Regions:
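Nucleotide-activated donor-binding/catalytic signature segment of Leloir-type glycosyltransferases, i.e.
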Residues: 245-263
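Aromatic "clamp/platform" in nucleotide-sugar-dependent glycosyltransferases that forms part
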Residues: 281
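Short hydrophobic beta-strand element within catalytic cores of glycosyltransferases
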Residues: 298-301
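A short helix/loop element that forms part of the nucleotide-sugar donor recognition site in Leloir-type
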Residues: 183-196
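Glycosyltransferase donor-sugar binding loop
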Residues: 43-44, 178, 206, 210, ...
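Helix-loop-beta element that forms the nucleotide-linked donor phosphate-binding surface
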Residues: 158-178
């Protein structure tokens, strides 16, 4: 029997695909008997510290007066080095190359012989937004080259990464996963709390509202739908929705839009929804889409990035920017509940078949053991 591992996971703590995936992965790894140590500047929103074998090490952002700006990379590297050495960690699994893989590289240099091996998972931003920027490109490339393994969450992102950076080793694709937790409220209870009647069609959108999520297009799709009077849009926002309030008023959607900010637990909202709507201009995977599929809700989205790999033929996909086509698909779901239900069930079946934790977590364990074994052979 293989021994349990000691794994350090570094991620951002906020609502967003990378942090949510990293937290879920660590939780699953701990349930499988591994010790998991999280590093971040705040406790990740979905991290349950009451579970056994899960530890959290908070990193204080540097505020030394000699620096013009607060520093995070160096305090993070020092904390990772301290814990990595004292706990004899086997792996640093970092989500995002900068600053996390850079901090991991520095930490391993501080530790020296016997340092943890570094596995870097790219979720998109390093490649699509920061990679083309000459201020970051060399640092990202350095961090990836000095990782013992690099993974991406989709084949689309793997191709983009290989085109953007000059890397020596193979990039492995390990998709995201989702573990369905039971809802604590019924569909009727949630809709009643939201002020939505059973006759209204509830569309859900979950994101951190970053510019790439194109919330402007999200609102315009709903505004363009002919069944707009019966559509309510629930936005589970990982950031302030205030910048978009003016557009809501401009489009006359004040009666259609409901916003819940910092909603970390989606299980209570998704059962009350009838469909999911996503309008990103760049999406390497689409974890929110996967969560929507797991609840058997039909999805309407743009055909970009890794989204087709997630949904297959179990969603309505359209070319980016085609608001009319997106609105027409939304109308079709409203007009045909049976077709909407059938599409949602196809999506659920696909999610359960390909993106369950039981399929994905062992792939990460295999990568960990491969890099450890490779080092020992060397």
């Amino acid at each position: 029997m293989e021994r349990p591992l000691k794994i350090g996971i570094t991620c951002f703590p906020l609502i967003g695909g990378s942090g949510i995936l990293a937290t879920a992965l660590g939780t699953e790894l701990a349930a499988r008997g591994h010790d998991v140590h999280f590093f971040s500047h705040a406790q990740p929103v979905r991290l349950d510290l009451s579970r056994p074998r899960i530890y959290f090490h908070q990193v204080e952002v540097g505020h030394a007066t000699v620096f013009p700006c607060p520093d995070y990379t160096l305090p993070l590297a020092v904390k990772m080095a301290e814990v990595g050495q004292s706990q004899r960690l086997d792996i640093f699994h970092v989500h995002y190359a900068v600053p996390h893989a850079t901090a991991a590289f520095l930490a391993t240099e501080m530790i020296g012989a016997g340092a943890p091996k570094v596995v870097t998972t790219l979720h998109g931003t390093d490649t699509t937004l920061l990679g083309p920027n000459p201020q970051y490109r060399a640092a990202i490339e350095h961090a990836l080259i000095h990782s013992d393994a690099v993974t991406t969450v989709s084949e689309s992102l793997r191709r983009q990464t290989e085109e953007t950076f000059q890397l020596r080793d193979e990039i492995r694709v390990i998709p995201n996963f989702f573990t369905l937790n039971p809802s604590t409220k019924s569909r009727e209870e949630v809709r009643r709390e939201l002020g939505i009647s059973d006759r209204e069609f509830l569309v859900v959108h979950m994101s951190n509202l970053r510019p790439t999520k194109r919330i402007d297009l999200l609102l315009r799709v709903v505004a363009a739908a002919s069944r707009r009077p019966s559509i309510r849009l629930l936005i589970l926002a990982g950031a302030s929705f205030e910048p978009f309030q003016a557009l809501v008023d401009e489009l006359g959607l004040r009666e259609n839009v409901i916003v819940r900010e910092d909603a970390a637990v989606v299980e209570d909202f998704l059962p009350a929804a009838d469909a999911g709507l996503y309008t990103s201009e760049n999406e390497s995977f689409g974890l929110s889409i996967l969560e929507t599929l797991f609840f058997g809700k039909p999805v309407v989205a743009f055909r970009i990035g890794g989204i087709p790999e997630v949904v297959g033929d179990a969603a309505y996909l359209h070319e980016f920017g085609d608001i009319a086509a997106m609105a027409a698909s939304l109308d079709a779901l409203v007009n045909s509940p049976d077709a909407a239900r059938e599409l949602g069930e196809r999506g659920r079946a696909r999610a359960e078949q390909y993106f369950a934790a039981t399929n994905i977590v062992p792939q990460y364990e295999a990568v960990y053991r491969q890099v450890i074994a490779k080092c020992h052979r060397a």
